[in-house]
Amino acid sequence: MELFKQVRILSFMRYSNYGVIVSAILVLLALGLLFFKGFSLGIDFAGGSLVQVRYTQNAPIKEVRDLFEKEARFKGVQVSEFGSKEEILIKFPFVETAENEDLNAIVANILKPSGDFEIRKFDTVGPRVGSELKEKGILSLILALIAIMVYVSFRYEWRFALASVVALVHDVILVASSVIVFKIDMNLEVIAALLTLIGYSINDTIIIFDRIREEMLSQKTKNATQAIDEAISSTLTRTLLTSLTVFFVVLILCVFGSKIIIGFSLPMLIGTIVGTYSSIFIAPKVALLLGFDMGKYYENEARKIKKAQEKEKMRRLYEGGQV
């Protein structure tokens, strides 16, 4: 189904300056949050335990919280409903235990006065493992950005490659800061959301860059701004339909999904909006700011064609025994 029977060329680049200014302000605010407030590290990165408990009656959340607060070594315990009124999720930082102590048994003993229950899941991550996971998570984001830059450089040119990475860094910073704003623990779910966002956002950007290249190869115009406007306008229907589809799916996950996946669903929801916006207004504009020019492009293409023709001529001379 098409939203528009005829493609109307919209002047996206005319308004892109405002988009860049707004993005610059948002990124500065986001960096302020990241550096001065920082993330609240989840169990995956800081170490700790996660306990899933099911009661035969409605779970006494307040009573469970009070029971843990009485214990000196259980600091920063979080208790929340999980899926149903009978089930709760208990999170607490890493607790040092003696060799003959069983943390599972200690928790069960603390919960005894709260009623009939069953511990359905008990996961513990040590501080060393958490630190390794954090390092690997950061490394995976950096490697993803480098790999994308290399790929786009080979497929297009360095200006497009750098522009796409700038847009992706913009997306990652804004979405990462939203994790702080909405008080979500930084864990592997958030890293998974950021990596998914990188793949989703670059896909939109590549489609627009592909159409820009088609406009250039057709040589209908020698104006870079016009070529970009035509490329974005011709792919706008596809971009909006894809983005809205992803947006509504992730919105359902946010509203009806379990709290345990909020670290993935909420960053993805925000990332869908930010990624679509950056693909349209940020990446093409950055390419222009870096000096992308149709005249230079045609000159480079002409040099490539001339070089290829010279190689072909030399090959024929060599095969004919004249060299």
UniProtKB/Swiss-Prot annotation:
GO terms for biological process: intracellular protein transmembrane transport; protein targeting; protein transport by the Sec complex. One of its GO terms (molecular function) is protein-transporting ATPase activity. It comes from the Bacteria. Keywords: Cell inner membrane, Cell membrane, Membrane, Protein transport, Translocation, Transmembrane, Transmembrane helix, Transport. Signal peptide: none annotated. It is found in: Cell inner membrane. One of its GO terms (cellular component) is plasma membrane. Coiled coil: none annotated. Its main location: membrane. It is a multi-pass membrane protein. The chain crosses the membrane at residues 19-39, 138-158, 162-182, 189-209, 244-264, 269-289. Belongs to the SecD/SecF family. SecF subfamily. PANTHER family: PROTEIN TRANSLOCASE SUBUNIT SECF, PROTEIN-EXPORT MEMBRANE PROTEIN SEC. Part of the Sec protein translocase complex. Interacts with the SecYEG preprotein conducting channel. SecDF uses the proton motive force (PMF) to complete protein translocation after the ATP-dependent function of SecA. Forms a complex with SecD. Part of the essential Sec protein translocation apparatus which comprises SecA, SecYEG and auxiliary proteins SecDF-YajC and YidC. This is Protein translocase subunit SecF. It comes from Helicobacter pylori (strain J99 / ATCC 700824).
